Amino acid sequence: MQMFRRSAVAWFVLTLVSLAVAQSTPQQQELNLPSSKTLQVPGPGAPQRTNSFPTAIALSPDGKYLAILNNGRGTPESKFEQSIAVLELTSNQLRDFPDARLGVDAKQTYFLGLAWSSDGSELYASMASESDPHGRNAGDTGNGVAVYQVRDGALSPERFVKLDFAPLGKGQHFAYNAKGIPKRKANPYPAGLAVVKGRDGDDLLVAENLADGAVLIDARSGKVLQRFGLTRGNLVPSNLPYGVVATRNGSRAWCSLWNGSAVAELDLRGGKVVRTIPLLPPEKNIDPSSHATAMLLSPDESRLYVALANRDAVAVIATSDGKAERYLDTRLPGQTYGGTFPNALAQSSDGKTLYVANASSDAVAVFDVLARSKTSAEYFIPTEWYPTAVAVHGDELLIATGKGQGTGPNSGWEENPEHPGKRSHPYIATMIRGSIARVHLAESEREQKKLTEEVLRSNLMEGRTGEIAFQRGINPIRHVIYIIKENRTYDQLFGDIASANGDPSLVMYGEAITPNQHKLAKQFGVLDNFYDSGEVSGDGHVWSTSAITSDYTEKTWEIVYRSKEHEYDYEGYVGDYMPMNAGIPDVDDPATGYLWGNLARHNLTYRNYGEFVSTTWCTDMEQNSPASTGAPSGHPPSCGRREVKPGEDLPPNLGTGKSPYQFAIPLIAYNTPTKPELKDHFDPNYADFQVEYPDQFRADEFLREFTGFVKARETGTGNQLPNFVLLRLPNDHTAGTRPGSPTPNASVADNDLAVGRVVEAVSNSPYWDDTAIFVLEDDAQSGADHVDAHRSIALVISKYSPGTAQQPAVDHHFYTTLNLIHTMEALLGLPPMNNNDAHAPVMAPLFTGAAEQPAFKADYRNRDNGMIYQANTRNAPGAKASAKMNFSIADAADTNVLNAILWKAAKGNVPMPVPQHTVFAEEKKRDED
């Protein structure tokens, strides 16, 4: 048993488990993932580590080499450059070839497409650009296909085949970072590509992801031979073409439409779209699309297989008439909830066996496709985290995964910093390596039962998720309040809690700055083994509200977070538009939905404050334009003021007197929900992410409505507290040290007090008997932690929490975002949304108290001492770099640079300590009670 430091008070320890890994056998270890699932490592096929997030693999025509496209964030080993790796299949030697054109600040990125030339002498890779699509600046390529010469398995850049802007059709308009794009044109942003037999050598068919089209070009000259428009209407992009596949004779091809729930059949010689084949489209136009992604032609080209990542299915299409004959079910045995994400395909040479990479199940499903009446898999092969590509080579199945074995501690200095002179801890996105495994198929056939059982265990489908047993028997909880904050690790805040597993040397915002969260943890329970499922805000807010992401999220966020060569297509926006308002699916939406949809379907009341809501600010509008500056609905005044400057009078809806804040506060013009279920279920006066808008005002607005809920309960008239309340309190993100913005300490202290005030109000109200409050960060990307880069703070607060102020509780159970979501669902009687939350054990130990937790009293010290009002000066460390950062939306600033600035601001010249722990602990117990 691990020993903990002594404290001035006794601590009630609920359960002791290891932090991440347990010894399963002398050969294997069980690794816990932030997805709540587990891996047995090493897994089948002796995986080798690769650069970050491989998305495509391709076998050379002679079968000697496997090329691997790594289009993630980049790792220290690759100098943070994207790369193509080459595996020599005879020797098993893996060599990586980073491309200097794809460094962390590059104006282009790899994106999905990889193919060998027909003679194996060249390798083609799609290269896409948003920030310099023209390729005008030195070192910038623009959009096109990078061509590499291959000699003895070694790559060297040979030429670049540029793609011009795609013409728009009549009435169409381009709405994806359209600034700088020529009129009547669209940015092609090449994705999947295929080599096509041409008259004079190789041609290339390229999916143009942002232009909603496909183009056939000469592989040498780049001359456009045919162009195919694939838009569903006038908005470009809307269908987002993903991949292409062509017949051997070069006459026909198919293009999968990521957001179109379809594939388009193309006549390559005639230059026509033969037909569009719908594949499990949504019932409503704005519901999630089926995500047609990877495609594969059978060896005899009579069947086309299409992975539908958002439907847990693979479509089997007869190429003779374009009809979908059947759909293969990629779910695991006994799986009743969705969420497997089939996103890659491979087939045996005899056409009998189809291999499907289930990204969300960490497994490959194996189908006998000649058994026409059967649609379920024969068995499953376990993989490392998030398989993204598969290929068959002889008796081997080659499997690439996007996230390998995850992260680990990030408490030391970055060995090879991306930005010299700005040393910081390793950034979570640069710690995620992919992997490539070689599984012997004959052996997997023999071991299929054992392998399938391992997949079921890894997906927690053989265990019990537990029940919440209150001391008095009946579940008293009728209301849940869920608070989502931004980006902090456990050690940054709670590393100073002596009786839990923290590292004091990593504390940046300890008890003096976050007294309320410390007090809450000590009263209601310290969770020192909690992990955020998301890596960054782009996927973190999806994880935190849907208990899953989408394959679109996973394949784009690392590009967004490396050099901004993709838009932040999350939280209800894609490019320059809101899909809901455009009447089309949001490509980022998981098919299994969000919490608010689950609540609506089961007739529970809910209200949302700031999450998946877009605020338009008066600072962005013309003065005196009509807007709702936070006034009650139906009484919209104009934006008479854009902001409140220091010392100016506060507007009535924000308080009385003069502003005590030393920085200007923007005013709300109006709010727009980005999801249909949030219409009429959001507070129009509550701000979204903007970190210069104090969390005190957000708390004020919620408490204004909460006062009405209390009155309604006391009088029995009016609207009472909804069953579910979602609050976004984002200011612990900070605005760095930008002059004239709140200091990091001010932002974090402001956020802390807002949390404390909400809990104080609820716990001193009639709702205390039947309300539970949950608090987490959407991700933990903005700090160091000595256990794992995903480890973060979480609070579970109710009258039924165990422990007392004299004997605080410490819970060492392994928990993630998914456990927290499943617990909220269980308390409200909601079914799970998907296979993730369905099998994540509930946080039952946190409701074993005697219903005697007293009301909470907030700590106002940092209001009274003025900390929350302070602004950065021009002399603050990192002020010049912070001044160039965008803090209007989540993570628009370079998080790695921001982290270095925040460390300097908090710790001065103190160097980061070396990692004290590894992710492999001595023992682990997964509780099922």
Question: For the regions a protein language model found, what residue spans apply to each?
Answer:
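Predominantly soluble domains enriched in secretory-pathway, periplasmic, or organellar proteins
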Residues: L16-E467
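Bacterial N-terminal signal peptides that target proteins for export
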Residues: M1-W11
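Residues at structural and domain junctions
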Residues: A8, P34, G43, R49, ...
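N-terminal pro-sequences and low-complexity stem/linker regions of secreted or lumenal proteins
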Residues: I432, E447-D929
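Short alpha-helical segments used as structural interaction elements across diverse proteins
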Residues: Q2-M3, N249, D300, V725
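Intrinsically disordered, low-complexity, compositionally biased regions/tails
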Residues: A10, Y124, Y148, A175, ...
